[in-house]
């Protein structure tokens, strides 16, 4: 499959740079995978699409203030973006202006450069940094000196709204550098209304890394190697999924990260035994993949040629997806992290589709 097959022209005016102040008022496109029919709604109308006995699964990761600045021993400034918290005092991070930074290099952070970090390892394009602090842990230091990193295409200054609205209302476990954006549309009244309707709600954790914004650099998408991310799917969630399916209910995944977490767990030995699945995953889902768990997916409108739109194509079908995106452009839906949402049901014929135009 060619990377160019997943390209489309997107007017810059449709890229959303600001969040919806009232989360659930964003626009919602509904597409049924088996028919390709499209309906235009508001996100709070999603309650009409979900039935009593269905199970919604959300990603409860929390975005950390992963961007902060420091100084090299030479006095040169660096920008650090945390990729992963490795331990009490260690982080894995990318460093801008990393020239002359090697194992053993010292970097100073915080007020009057009082926090010292040492580069103790280099892994691909990332550096492992050890903080020399006997009081605060790495996450404490990050919380004190860092800022929430908005997606790289948003060039404006961050504001107080971003601090709140670039997190989900059900965030719990710290570790992401980007929000699970499909979940941003849920507010507490909507979650309560779903619960009152008899919809079950549970959570997985997948900490989203910087790789979510990295472009594919291969012409043939099958040659792409996905970045690795930490994932947790509890035994109780696995048991709930099996029980829901057995009773005829549907599994609704909120976000591509949730779907990837569930598929990763499904292919593990822990799934058959209903054990906790705690691991790293680099699962790459693209057309031809046969989905095993999720019946409906809530997701945003994604970048051209991204792994995210490839996942959507695998779930909804290539022709359906491209038709939905063309319809979204014509109807001026907002795209990307702060944009509008889709509710799509699984097209079981998608793996067999000859999608190349």
UniProtKB/Swiss-Prot annotation:
Pathway-wise, it operates in: tRNA modification; tRNA-queuosine biosynthesis
Q: Decide whether keyword Endoplasmic reticulum is in the record.
A: no
Could you state a single Gene Ontology molecular function term? Answer: S-adenosylmethionine:tRNA ribosyltransferase-isomerase activity
Protein EC: 2.4.99.17
Cysteine pairings via disulfide bonds = none
Question: What is its subcellular localisation?
Answer: Cytoplasm
GO cellular component terms, A-Z = cytoplasm
Instruction: Note the InterPro entries from the entry.
Output: QueA (IPR003699), QueA_dom1 (IPR042118), QueA_dom2 (IPR042119), QueA_sf (IPR036100)
The record's keywords, sorted A to Z, are: Cytoplasm, Queuosine biosynthesis, S-adenosyl-L-methionine, Transferase
Q: Biological process GO terms, please?
A: queuosine biosynthetic process; tRNA wobble guanine modification
The catalytic activity, as recorded, is: 7-aminomethyl-7-carbaguanosine(34) in tRNA + S-adenosyl-L-methionine = epoxyqueuosine(34) in tRNA + adenine + L-methionine + 2 H(+)
Q: What does this protein do?
A: Transfers and isomerizes the ribose moiety from AdoMet to the 7-aminomethyl group of 7-deazaguanine (preQ1-tRNA) to give epoxyqueuosine (oQ-tRNA).
The family this protein is said to belong to = Belongs to the QueA family.
* Subunit structure of this chain's protein: Monomer.
Q: What is this protein called?
A: S-adenosylmethionine:tRNA ribosyltransferase-isomerase
Gene field: queA
């Amino acid at each position: 499959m060619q990377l160019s097959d997943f390209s489309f022209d997107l007017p810059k005016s449709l890229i959303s740079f600001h969040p919806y102040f009232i989360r659930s008022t964003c626009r919602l496109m509904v597409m049924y995978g088996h028919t390709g029919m499209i309906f235009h709604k508001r996100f709070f109308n999603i309650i009409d699409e979900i039935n009593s006995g269905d199970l919604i699964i959300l990603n409860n990761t929390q975005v950390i203030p992963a961007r902060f600045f420091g100084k090299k021993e030479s006095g040169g400034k660096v920008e650090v973006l945390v990729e992963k918290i490795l331990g009490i005092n260690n982080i894995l991070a990318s460093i801008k202006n990393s020239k002359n930074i090697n194992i053993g290099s010292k970097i100073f952070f915080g007020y009057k450069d009082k926090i010292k970090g040492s580069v103790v390892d280099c892994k691909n394009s990332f550096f492992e940094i050890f903080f020399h602090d006997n009081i605060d842990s790495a996450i404490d230091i990050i919380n004190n000196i860092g800022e929430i990193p908005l997606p790289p295409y948003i060039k404006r200054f961050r504001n107080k709204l971003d601090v709140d609205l670039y997190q989900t209302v059900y965030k719990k476990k710290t570790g992401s550098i980007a929000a699970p954006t499909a979940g941003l549309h849920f507010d507490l009244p909507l979650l309560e209304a779903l619960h009152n309707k008899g919809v079950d709600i549970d959570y997985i954790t997948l900490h989203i890394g910087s790789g979510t914004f990295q472009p594919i650099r291969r012409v043939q998408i099958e040659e792409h190697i996905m970045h690795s991310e930490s994932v947790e799917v509890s035994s109780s969630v696995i048991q709930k999924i099996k029980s829901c399916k057995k009773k005829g209910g549907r599994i609704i995944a909120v976000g591509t990260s949730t779907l990837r977490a569930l598929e990763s767990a499904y292919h593990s030995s822990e799934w058959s035994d209903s054990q906790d699945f705690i691991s790293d995953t680099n699962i790459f889902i693209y057309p031809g993949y046969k989905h095993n768990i999720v019946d409906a997916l809530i997701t945003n409108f994604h970048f051209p040629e991204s792994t995210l739109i490839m996942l959507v194509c695998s779930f909804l079908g290539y022709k359906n997806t491209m038709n939905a995106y063309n319809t979204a452009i014509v109807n001026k839906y907002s795209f990307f992290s702060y944009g509008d949402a889709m509710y799509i049901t699984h097209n079981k014929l998608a793996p067999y589709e000859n999608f190349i135009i």
